[in-house]
Amino acid sequence: IMMLGDKSIKPEEKLTRVYPQKNLFSHIIGQIDDDNNGIAGLEKSLDEQLKKNKDKIQLTVDKDIQFLIREELIKYNQIFRSNGSAAILMDVNNGEIISLVSIPDFDPNLRTNITDKNYINRVTKGVYEFGSVFKTFTLAAAFHEDIIEPQTQFNNLEKKLKCGKNTISEYDEKIPSDLSAEQILIRSGNIGSVRIGQSL
């Protein structure tokens, strides 16, 4: 077009981001606006560094693990017909994030076709009831206070327990009535967790 010599046509340089992995790291990488300013994810938190520094930025995420976890989430999203799901995998020895996946995700190369719900990072911005995840904190507090040890035994645990105005029951009737603290955590025992919580 420029070879036509039409003076009304002027070239304009514009930087464009290209994301070869498409959806795979979308919520980690985040987004930019029309002027290439970071507005979410690493694009936002490392905005200045990305603009000034031409060197590569090394992340701790593993591409293969990220792929496998994403595939599993997509599969079970379809099986359970859920609105979305999320997973995070961290190395507990050093805090490095090995994988962070939020479904639905998006292809940052095709931002014009993305709905708002796809932009939500369910790992960092999702709001959830604690549910059984909180059992970890209950047991950790009891260990910290030297109230229990992993092998502390809890016998004759009921299948239902009245807690204030609420009745708490086991999600699985097959959970034994005699469990160690370790087994309560492994089997996600509701009654045993309440008993430990009451001892704090």
Model-flagged regions — what are they?
Residues K22, I98-S102, L110, Q151:
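Short, solvent-exposed loop/turn and secondary-structure capping segments
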Residues G30-D35, S99-D105:
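Short beta->alpha transition motifs characteristic of CBS
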Residues N53-N93, P108-L200:
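Active-site loop and adjoining helix of the penicillin-binding protein/serine DD-peptidase-beta-lactamase fold
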